[in-house]
Amino acid sequence: MKKIIALALAAVLLLSFTSCTKQNGTATSSGALKGQPKNALEILEKVWSKYSADEKFSATGGSGKHMKEDMPGKFDVSDAEALDFELGFPKANASEIDDAASLMHMLNQNNFSCGVYHVKGSGNAEALAGKIKENILARQWLCGFPEKLVILTVGDYVVSVFGAKELTDTFTAKLSAEYSSTKQLFDVPIA
């Protein structure tokens, strides 16, 4: 009788260890997915939340009914003209994205402007990043020149930021710290 109970307990322990191993394996898989953004706005919100009070500046984000003060906001991807005018996203390529968010310096957008775009076609992010770079570098600037342009990817998201060197460097450092999959494609002077 004792042998049967001992075998039953051993079987229960073996099964419980096996199920714990599967749960831990699943947690690891979902942990990897956890590091991937759910949408464009999430990327900017996470990065902005890492700014200290001293690092933050007067900001605005989003477009139209999604406009936010002192925080990032969702940008309407159906408004190709606004994407181009405000963020430097080429209007001819607006159909290639299905989600966008923005964060801009409230007083002078040339100090800091950032757009995050979800690319519809997986694998097309780098090609689209090149078109964004060309469009921004071809602009005619008023009220001073931004110092630099940085374009990065986070999975299927393209992140474009231009402005003062200190502000763009702070943003890119915080983005890279938040998302390990961040890949810098361009870091070029504008002025």
Predicted features along the sequence, with ranges:
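Positively charged n-region of N-terminal signal peptides that target proteins for export
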Residues: 1-4, 8
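Repetitive helical segments and hydrophobic/amphipathic motifs
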Residues: 11-12
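C-terminal motif of bacterial Sec signal peptides marking the signal peptidase cleavage site
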Residues: 15-19
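Soluble, non-membrane globular domain cores that form compact, hydrophobic packing
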Residues: 21-113, 119-191
